[in-house]
Regions:
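ABC ATPase C-loop
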Residues: 173-174
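Conserved ABC transporter NBD signature motif
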Residues: 82-91, 102, 135-139
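ABC-type ATPase nucleotide-binding domains, specifically the catalytic core motifs of the NBD
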Residues: 39, 79, 119-137, 145-147, ...
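The feature captures the beta-strand-to-loop junction immediately N-terminal to the Walker
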Residues: 60-62
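Helix-to-loop junction immediately C-terminal to a conserved catalytic motif
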Residues: 75
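Catalytic Walker B motif of ABC-type/P-loop ATPase nucleotide-binding domains
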Residues: 181-185
């Protein structure tokens, strides 16, 4: 997490759209009174949240809180009531493919890698909607972030460890040259050394003009690396603030940080 600004956001950082510094741009992702149901089961209930350009926002909360449902809804995979806008336009009116073309890239919890394909082939697939002339540049950036991937570039994805596969999934998402990178549970079950590698990648990613939305069960990781955090419970946001604000919240301390 950058610490250049008052709330941990570099005030001079520009979004990829080039509209100006973070904090003065149009909100990149906004949900208003957002509700999603699976049959008769409500997964999101009147959720309101906003993601500003150039920041890391994390959604935390227990299993079933609605974190992944929001990520899937924002990416155009689910029908919804209320509103969720990407750069001021309703997601439902944009569509999944167009969202990717406009720079919303979703790295799912399942990773969705092709196990029989090499690291390099998986990475190249991430750039399939981009011009060929950016492929080499993006590949070099990913290998600089995650040297382990370059060392294993000819290795099949299925033979890699879970942590290495997570790096590959993030790397493939970055190959799409995102404006908004959605990382769904990127640290789940990973060893500390892999967590460190992923965390150290955040600032270089932000410097590329990328905004990051994390869903996290690892509350400590979110508090260490996010600029703003929303605590979701039962499909709605019950707390929102900076890491410092939430560390001082008695409910957060007692319920999620062991008192």
């Amino acid at each position: 997490m950058s610490t250049d600004g008052a709330d941990g956001v570099d005030p001079t950082r520009e979004s990829k759209s080039g509209t100006g510094p973070a904090g003065t741009d149009t909100t990149i992702l906004r949900a208003r009174d957002l509700s999603v149901s699976y049959g008769k089961v409500a997964a999101l209930r009147g959720l309101d949240l906003a993601v500003e350009p150039g920041e890391i926002v994390s959604l935390i909360g227990p299993n079933g809180a609605g974190k992944t449902t929001f990520a899937n809804t924002a990416s155009g995979f689910l029908e919804y009531d209320g509103s969720v806008e990407y750069n001021g336009e309703e997601v439902a009116e944009i569509g999944q493919t167009e969202l990717v073309e406009r720079g919303m890239i979703h790295c799912t919890e399942k990773r969705d890698l092709f196990g029989h394909m090499t690291v390099e082939d998986n990475l190249e697939l991430g750039a399939y909607l981009r011009d060929d002339d950016v492929l080499e540049e993006r590949m070099a950036f990913v290998y600089e972030l995650f040297p382990r991937l370059e060392e294993r570039r000819g290795q099949n994805a299925r033979s890699m460890s879970g942590g290495e596969q997570q790096m590959l999934a993030i790397g493939r998402a970055l190959m799409g040259d995102p404006e908004l990178l959605i990382l769904d549970e990127p640290t789940l079950g990973l060893a500390p050394v892999i967590l460190k590698d992923i965390a150290e990648a955040f600032d270089p990613i932000l410097e590329q003009g990328v905004t990051i939305l994390l869903t996290e069960q690892n509350v400590t990781f979110a508090l260490e690396h996010a600029d703003r955090i929303y605590l979701l419970e039962n499909g709605t946001a019950v707390r929102e603030g900076t890491p410092e604000e939430l560390k001082g919240d008695e409910y957060i301390r007692d319920s999620y940080l062991g008192g």
